[in-house]
Amino acid sequence: MRFAALALSAVLLAACAPKSAAYISPTPTPIPTPAAQSQPSPSPQPSPTPDPTHVFVIVMENRSFAQVAGNSYIAHLATQYGVATNYHGVSHPSLPNYLALTSGSTWGIADDGFHALPAGGLGSELSAAGIDWRAYMEGMTRTCFNSPYPYALKHDPFAYYGASCPAQVVAFSRFASDMSGTVPRFVWITPDLCHDGHDCSNAVAESWLAQTVPLILATPAWQDNGLLLITWDEGEDSANSVLTLVIQPNPLLHQSSRPYNHYSLLATIEDELGVPRLGEAAQASPMSDLLATPPVPPLRHNQTG
């Protein structure tokens, strides 16, 4: 993984070169496949960071780490904020990964069909704790169960818990206006089947991110100790590697090679919002080394005599 991180650094340094206002695509550089998936080591659940505010999550589709790391806007974000270089999806196809991200379990599901699961999941947990949240589904023009393409029910995990459409799951058309008003403590964003990269190119998906992410970064909700997490549901390589960005106002570490997965991301969300961890997230390592928390002083070797 050290070689993979160094190779990524070469790509990201290219993105840091002086440029005009428009982003300039760096010269594509092959990036070695990240190491095969290893389970994150169990860790005690830490206390939430002081005064946690808002957490935003964007889930993109079907790209391995190397397929997106060199993209212009993504490389720009990775040079400015945190990037996990040893992060993996937990299953295939899409649905079990979305369920893992929102409940700490794949529920043994290995397809993208509809499954009526018990009520619960992250949304219910937040509601029970009195934390306001909203999930924005791009392309959802009717209810969560009967909206046509390019909306995809399999990318709306909140509809599976209790087989219902929570009131907090809304159309993405509300997103821009909501960001200029009162922003919920937790925000989930699912792009439509084109903008998430599922049916369209990297360039289209990256352009969507370049339009959407600045709307989040411009909010006081993010600027005041907020956290934006961008990940991909599953990779297309044998290791199921995906790139994950950890975007905070004052990051301390740009790259982490620690082994993380979707349970780690859920643990991070729950720790930041101060709620108990669900399912496998209870045993996962949160992405604490990429968060903007006070650094640990370096160890010093004091010689005497």
Regions found by a protein language model. Give the residues of each.
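Residue-level signal for mature regions of secreted extracellular proteins and peptides
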Residues: 9-10, 158
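C-terminal motif of bacterial Sec signal peptides marking the signal peptidase cleavage site
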Residues: 12-15
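Sec-dependent signal peptide recognition
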Residues: 1-7
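Ser/Thr-rich, Proline-interspersed low-complexity disordered segments
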Residues: 19-49
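Flexible, surface-exposed loop/gating regions in the mature catalytic domains
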Residues: 44-305
